[in-house]
C-alpha cells in the first residue's frame, strides 16, 4: 500500500516506526540534500529536528564506560574527538581533510559541476585499511568506523569513498524527520501529482521489453503496459536482469553481477518503551563488543543467537 521503499513506516501499539530512514544528513541550507529537496519543492514542507550538535552519534564499546561522540560540523567533530584523543590530533585532522577531499570528486553529490580529473584509484581504497593507516590507536579506529552499519561495513570490501560520502553528509548536519520518513514519500507524491504526473501502487512489473537497444516499455502482472524513454529500477540488480528479456548488457557484466556475494542483513528489534522510564536523548547509539567494529557481517548460522 505504501510508496517509498525504505521510506516506509509501520505502526504497532499506536506508535510509528521507521523501517530505513531514521536520520538523514546534509539538510542545512546550501548542503546537498537540502538543495535536492528544495529543487523538488518539498524542503519547506518537511518538519525536521536537528540532532545533538556535540554528538548526534555516540559510539560505545563493551567494558568501556566512555561514550565517544560524533560531533556535527567538522570543527566540532575534531573538537569532540581531540578532547578524548589529544595525542591523535593529526590523525583526526587528516581524516577530516581526506573525507572532504574525496567528496569533491563527485559532482552530483555536491550538486555542482567541477573540473576535477577523477582518479579511479579512489574507488579501490579500503575503508578499514585506510583508517588503520591514519592511526594505530585501536579505540580511535573503532570510533571513526563505529557507524559503519550505515553502509553495511565489510572488512575487506567497503571502499573509503562510500564511507566518505555518507559520513560527510552526517557530519555536516544530521536531522530526524518529524512524523517519520514516510513524510518524504508523501510529499514527493503530492508534488508529482501537482505537476501532472501519476503514481501507481501495487503494480508488479514482470517484464521490461526492448526495442532498438533501449527499454521501450514495462509490462505488469495485470497485463498493463507502460511506455517511456527512461526506466529506473531500484530492486536488486540480479532481479532487474531477469526482467529484461532481450538483454542490452554484455553477458560478462551480467555474470559478474550475478556472482557477487550479497551482504548480510540485520536483525532489528523495535520496542515501545514505558512512559517516563528512560530520558529522551537526541542521539543515536552504536554498541560493539570490542574495538573491532568490522566483525558484524562475518557471521555464521551456527553462531545464532550471539
Predicted regions and their residues:
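Rossmann-like flavin
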Residues: 62-158
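Glycine- and acidic
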Residues: 18, 113, 146, 168-176, ...
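Glycine-rich phosphate/pyrophosphate-binding beta-alpha loops
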Residues: 21-26, 148-153, 266-268
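Ligand-binding pocket scaffold of soluble enzyme catalytic domains
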Residues: 144, 149, 157, 189, ...
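Helical element adjacent to the flavin cofactor pocket in flavoenzyme catalytic cores
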Residues: 164-221, 229
